[in-house]
Design a protein with these regions (language model features):
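Charged, amphipathic alpha-helical coiled-coil/dimerization segments
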Residues: 5, 85-146
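Amphipathic, non-transmembrane alpha-helical scaffold segments
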Residues: 26-30, 34, 73, 115, ...
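N-terminal leader segment of winged-helix/HTH proteins
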Residues: 1-45, 170
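Active-site phosphate/pyrophosphate-handling residues
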Residues: 24, 53, 139
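C-terminal regulatory/oligomerization modules of transcriptional regulators
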Residues: 1-16, 136-170
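N-terminal helix-turn-helix DNA-binding core of bacterial DNA-binding proteins
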Residues: 31, 35-79, 91, 160
Length: 170
């Protein structure tokens, strides 16, 4: 195979350590769980992981708005809006006009039934990854993950402030 003259055929001298780069490991774990869950949910219910997350958020916080779901599950509002449309079309949720433009979301009886049918699939993923950990290790892991999430939120707030300030000198 002949490479173009501007192709770099060797690894870069400074790269992440793929075996010890924590964000990569977290992403691999998350992606693996999401892929498995998505396959099962699509096959059994014709719904995906994002739809499940929206159903779950509404089950946890009845009356939540799409914007609040977006913040709660940390996904783009467009993804939530698409799921809200799908779930509404399937009569799994209803929207109730709130003040202004926002709408509160509630499960219907069919939505509550769907939640209860989907829940074991999500819980199975948790069982799989935590099977070899003691209850104390699970508690420690969850505490560490909550700390990491808190740091990420701080970083996002810093980035937002930086974006508001505009570009610096070039």
């Amino acid at each position: 195979m002949e490479l173009p003259p501007d192709a770099i055929p060797t690894p870069m001298p400074t790269v992440i350590d793929a075996n010890d780069f924590t964000p990569r490991l977290l992403a691999l774990l998350s992606n693996s769980l999401v892929w498995r869950e998505s396959q099962v949910l699509r096959r059994r219910f014709g719904l995906g992981t994002n739809d499940w997350r929206v159903i779950s958020a509404i089950a946890i916080r009845p009356g939540i708005t799409a914007s609040e779901i977006s913040e709660f599950i940390v996904v783009n509002k467009a993804i939530v809006s698409k799921s809200v449309g799908v779930l509404g079309d399937r009569r799994l949720i209803v929207q109730v006009e709130d003040t202004g433009r926002s709408r509160q979301l509630f499960l219907t009886p069919a939505g509550a039934e769907m939640h209860d049918a989907m829940l074991p699939i999500s819980m199975r993923g948790q069982e799989i990854i935590l099977a070899d950990l003691s209850p104390e290790e699970v508690d420690r892991l969850n505490a560490l993950l909550r700390r990491l999430l808190s740091r990420v939120r701080e970083l996002q707030a810093e980035d937002t402030l930086e974006d508001l300030r505009g570009p610096g000198p070039v």
